[in-house]
Amino acid sequence: MNTQPFTNSKGVISGNCWRIGVLSDSLLRLEWSDTGEFNDDTTLMAVNRDFGTPPEYSTSIADGLLTVETTALRLTYDMRPFSKEGLSIVVKGVKDTKTNTWHFGDAQEGNMKGTARTLDWADGAIPLNDGVVSRDGWSVLDDSNTCLFADNGDIKPRKNAGIDLYFFGHGHRYADAVADFCRLSGRSPLLPRYALGNWWSRFHRYTSEEYVALMDRFKSEGIPFTTSVIDMDWHLVDDVDPKYGSGWTGYTWNRKLIPDPQRFLGDLHERGCHVSLNVHPRDGIRAFEDCYPSAAKTMGISPDSGEPVEFDLTDPRFVRAYFDMHHDLEADGVDFWWIDWQQGGVTRQPGLDPLWVLNHMHYCDSARDGRWPLILS
């Protein structure tokens, strides 16, 4: 991953416990640290803080107040712990004086929202997180509690508590706000061409013969498909001994339905379809799985013990066992994975969302050996 975590030094104004970064004429980074230690690592959100030569701006101090001014913004700050009374920013391009000034802590009432973490349990309208465009002319992204990337790509927690905000003061230049966000967070990767075609997915217990016959029927009717998404019944579900728990998580082919997985996937490839399998990783790797002996050895567990390999993406040994297992299935012909996580947002590392890290690790893994990366989540 190409990252530029350091803000150009010419765009940084700082004191003992505060730091302001001028990334663009409308985008500022605002930091407070009681210890005076600031974060210059890449976060899970911010991967590029160097936008090149900073825009022209001026600074001045009068009556104990710092003023930082760009062509688009005017910041006023009392150089003390951030407060509503001591930190404010005027967005020059917004004529409405009721909304053109942000004070630290203000609610984002005009925010036009961004994305949702997941559509699980959605039935109609759902709450969305704040985005970077707003009818008020400004928005704030709080990056204070986001985990960090280490130099080797591992994910680590922040060392020090503090405040780390990004102020988007683009007025009603919404496209410019999104463009600055893309520069900060990294450009969206290009999808492989086949992903833009028709996909087939149905929660139905297909046999391999039924599925291939369905693809042939689609072709005969002139309905083209480029992607076959196969739901959870590709693996053992009802045949799992209750002592292991449910069959929700599984990695062993159900050979009652799909007796020859390699042939089945090969048949789909011959028909021009890329194949994705559904996975629910929450229950880890249990003793009934074909891959259990290998995974147990990787974890230092005796395969004879039957002890489950618990799901824990903060453990490098589990990560290795987990992806070795997926690589073996890919050798059968699986092209990419449908990451179907529905079990909450907690890992053993504070601030690290299991769905986020699953998506990140699977996406990076899918890019190995020069492949064009893709996941469904």
Residue positions per predicted region:
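Short, solvent-exposed loop/turn and secondary-structure capping segments
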Residues: 41, 80, 87-89, 142-143, ...
